[in-house]
Design a protein with these regions (language model features):
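Short, acidic/small-residue loops that bind anionic groups at enzyme active sites
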Residues: 216-224, 266, 308-309, 315, ...
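Structural motif
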Residues: 195-196
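Active-site donor-nucleotide binding/catalytic segment of nucleotide-sugar enzymes
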Residues: 154-168, 185
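Short glycine/serine/threonine-rich phosphate/pyrophosphate-binding segments
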Residues: 171, 200-204, 313-320
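C-terminal functional extensions of proteins
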Residues: 297-299, 333-399
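Long, compositionally biased, glycine/small-hydrophobic-enriched stretches that function as flexible linkers
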Residues: 1-135
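Glycine-rich phosphate/diphosphate-binding loop of Rossmann-like nucleotide-binding domains
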Residues: 172, 183-188
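Acidic/glycine-enriched connector segments
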Residues: 23, 27-28, 32-41, 47-48, ...
């Protein structure tokens, strides 16, 4: 059965899986992703390839491409001269984004892709670059769905989003609170997802990454990170993160669940690539499109959301999430937990707007979703027990 390979039976993403189908004599209707078919080339001359989609596979023989096309296949090549894959078949790992760190912040793979992004027009790229970026983001979508489907099938736990200010310094009270929430949620079997930036987002992934260690180990890690508290100095900030990563519990054998307790998920964007990469998530779904990225985070986090203090970006996420809850766009929502009473009732009193808004939802009075607290224990309990029964079925990036 194809399920022996992964949770996407119509997609072939390894040579072993390809060989399995070749032995059956048919690739008809399948999608073959990201395989190096120029290495020990498989014999495709007699296999059925009608309606087979080859995406970003390395095929160096033009006659083979022509033959596959004549026989009913569609071949979408990996676009050349890009620093990034135009159809990634898996999510990024911290090691991918940090590659080249010996040459400083500017040498990081993550930074080099960001410089490429800016040099080619950023969010307003020319048609060729825009196409390459869209193909890349589609590949991330697909890899993320595979990852979440596998995790949900094996775990069944809810996905919880943690939002908040990117400028929150390492070692601050809010940073420590977010890290502790991330740790406790991971221990409770939840998947922590963040926007993949620094500040509160880094803290939550760090907490999840330390969730298999003793609680006091997290304090030690934060104390060490606090030696490089702000991301203005990308070199020092990244160097300290890499040092602390060496002190994290090892992930061990890869499976569909364990990674959630070794950092969880982050969903960053190269639109904000001037900020150092958050290197504490175990799986990283990095997009070029910030609009897709924002929607993806909120679509996944059906189990609930934590909003630590933040400014414009966080407030945008608050009301985008509220809109989704109001119209049940992605199904029922878990609780909205606002951490820092003074900030959310005084500085930016969103509670006064959200409660009457959500009370008038066509799906009933949803004002009860809104909670404001300073208590980490209360926040975690609300999230652990507040996920809707439908969360398991709706925490996907696509229907």
């Amino acid at each position: 059965m194809t399920e022996a390979y992964d949770h996407s039976p119509d997609e072939v993403e390894s040579r072993e899986e390809l060989d399995y189908h070749l032995a059956k004599g048919s690739l008809a209707g399948l999608t073959i992703q990201g395989l190096a078919l120029d290495r020990d080339p498989p014999d495709l001359s007699t296999v059925d390839v009608s309606n087979t989609l080859f995406v970003a596979c390395r095929i160096t023989d033009p006659e083979l491409v022509a033959d596959l096309t004549r026989r009913g296949a569609i071949v979408v090549p990996d676009l050349h001269n890009r620093l990034y894959p135009t159809h990634p078949s898996r999510l990024y790992a911290p090691e991918d984004l940090a590659a080249g760190h010996r040459n400083g912040f500017e040498g990081l793979y993550d930074t080099r892709v960001y410089r490429h992004f800016v040099a080619h027009g950023g969010a307003l790229a020319d048609i060729r670059e825009a196409l390459a970026q869209r193909l890349h983001d589609h590949g991330i979508d697909d890899a993320l769905n595979d990852t979440i489907d596998a995790w949900t099938a094996a775990s069944g736990g809810p996905v919880i989003g943690v939002m908040g200010g990117h400028a929150e310094p390492r070692g601050s009270r809010a940073y420590r609170h977010a890290a502790e929430i991330g740790r406790r949620l991971a221990v409770a079997g939840c998947l922590v997802v963040t926007g993949g930036g620094p500040g509160v987002m880094e803290a939550a992934n760090l907490g999840a990454a330390a969730s298999t260690a003793q609680p006091e180990h997290l304090t030690t890690l934060i104390d060490q990170l606090a030696a490089a508290p702000r991301f203005d100095d990308g070199d020092a900030y990244t160097r300290k993160a890499l040092e602390v990563r060496e002190l994290l519990p090892p992930e061990g054998a890869a499976d569909a669940v364990a990674w959630a307790r070794h950092g969880g998920l982050s969903v960053p964007t190269w639109l904000y690539g001037h900020e150092p990469a958050n290197l504490f998530a175990a799986r990283i779904a990095k997009y070029f499109s910030n609009a897709i990225r924002e929607d993806t985070i909120l679509r996944l986090a059906r189990g609930g959301l934590v909003f630590a203090a933040g400014r414009a970006g966080t407030v945008q996420e608050v009301f985008q999430a509220a809109t989704k809850a109001f119209y049940a766009t992605d199904g029922a929502s878990g609780p909205f937990v606002f951490l820092d009473t003074e900030f959310w009732t005084g500085t930016l009193p969103v509670e006064k707007l959200l409660r009457p808004l959500l009370a008038d939802s066509p799906y009933g009075d949803l004002a009860k979703l809104v909670h404001v607290t300073d208590d980490v224990d209360e926040a975690v309990e609300l999230l652990r027990h507040g996920a809707p029964a439908t969360a398991r079925d709706t925490q996907r990036t696509t229907p």
